Amino acid sequence: GSHGGATAEGQLQILKDYGITEEAMGCPIKSSMETVQIGLSGVRHQPVFMDKNASEADGIILFNRIKPHTSFRGPYESGLMKMMAIGLGKQKGAESIHHQSPAIMHELIEEYGRTFIDNVPIIGGIAVIENAYDETYLIKGLTPQEIITEEPKLKELSYKTIAHILFDKCDVLVVDKIGKNISGDGMDPNISGRFVLPQYCSGGIQAEKCVILDITDETHGNAQGVGLAEVTTRRLVNRMKLEMTYPTGVTNTFLHLMKIPMIMDNDREALQLALCCCPEAEDQNNMKMIRIPDTAHIEYIEISEGLLPLAKENPNIEILTEPYDLPFDENGNLF
């Protein structure tokens, strides 16, 4: 798709971050944004594009996580079908899908994916499902036809294995870091509750205000998803690279993902602002706040004392410490 700033060099860097290099793999890695048309989609007769290098291969093996998508619901969400329709399509292919109505996204993923299976030498796919601890739960090899029949079943299984914050709602959700290496939207809305298109998706915790403190190193300045928060920090904005962030928005058309929220000078001020702007809070003197490292790692989270009674009632929650003050440094930051 358009990852890596929609450049060949940027996509090579993403692979390098995952330890995938020519030296490590013992084979060439070809990266290009050039595409060729492989046919027309079966129902809407739209042109379907594919990476030119991949089109010249004798065979293609797909690999992707199967997981709930962040923007739509359907038989095929994030997985092997999407890896063909959007991933192998590079930016041009991704744009051709995203520039159509989000209401039919699930139909387009299947339609374009089937076009690949019918026109390209797909050998098969390797589907991976992760558990709530960001660990591999299942690895399954699929033939091209099994991708069509089995991926929907694997998607349903993935809904049962993903992580959840074990509270229905809070006043303020604090996310230390977002990034494309965490989720396509920077943070997974199936956990944060902050959906790009809430008219099509729901789930996750319901927070009146959301604060995002920083971006990951691995996202290389791509701050997509920061627009889903109400408050952020100057640190994040200083690390944000528009040339990495904006191409993703142009490709997926969700420009509000790139909007910059209110900027505070440090973490303390960001939290203070969010906490004082929650008119729906049940108790203004005992606010319910949750802090998570990112949406891929929520085994250990911090909660304010306002949530302690609910935590004690939940047998799935273990309270590890007594209440303590957040460890702000001399600059008012948490890290």
Language-model segment annotations:
Residues G10-P75:
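An acidic, phosphate/nucleotide-engaging active-site surface
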Residues P189-F335:
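C-terminal non-catalytic interaction/assembly regions of soluble proteins
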Residues L15, G19, V120, G141-P144, ...:
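Short, electropositive alpha-helical surface patch
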Residues S32-E34, F63-I66, I126-N131, L157, ...:
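Fold-independent oxyanion-binding glycine-rich loops
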Residues M50-G179, I205:
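Conserved, well-structured core segments that form the ligand-binding/active-site neighborhood
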Residues S2-G4, G179-N181, E218:
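Short active-site-proximal "capping" loops at secondary-structure junctions
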Residues H3-K30, I147-L157, C277:
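Alpha/propeptide regions of enzymes that mature by internal proteolysis
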Residues G1, G5-Q11, L40-V43, S71-Y76, ...:
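Short acidic, glycine/serine/threonine-rich loops at helix termini
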